[in-house]
Regions:
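Charge-rich, low-complexity N-terminal segments
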Residues: 1-50, 56-124
Length: 124
């Protein structure tokens, strides 16, 4: 079990990294492959040496793949910027991943609506 202070620090660092990556993505990356992307979460490893950056991409799966390629190409630039802006001696290794949870959320809501309609029909 890790001390609460370490977990708190790691969570705060993850949130600061998320905000900085959002800022970098909004105006500093000129890669045409990167579409409309937002950072939903940054999940830090226990040792804070790596971070999984969860991104939402507007568009279809092809658009998501192109954006992921662009983000991975810009990974070292983003790490360098994080080190400077947050004054990190060793910025975490970044791993970009498409966050599909919002799509699953919509699907679950759709299934719940169907179940409600069925139960209403049975009650009638």
């Amino acid at each position: 079990m890790e001390p609460r202070a370490q977990k708190y620090h790691r969570d705060r660092l993850g949130e600061a990294i998320r905000e900085e990556i959002e800022t970098i993505l909004e105006g500093e990356l000129g890669d045409p492959r990167i579409g409309l992307v937002s950072v939903s979460a940054v999940l830090m490893a226990d040792d804070a040496r790596s971070a999984r950056v969860m991104v939402n991409v507007e568009g279809d799966d092809d658009e998501a793949e192109r954006s992921l390629e662009g983000l991975n190409a810009a990974k070292n630039y983003v790490r360098h910027e994080l080190a400077e802006r947050l004054r990190l001696r060793r910025p975490p290794e970044l791993f970009f991943q498409v966050d599909r949870s919002h799509k699953m959320e919509g699907r679950v809501e759709e299934l719940l609506e169907r179940a409600k309609k069925r139960s209403r029909k049975k009650a009638e």
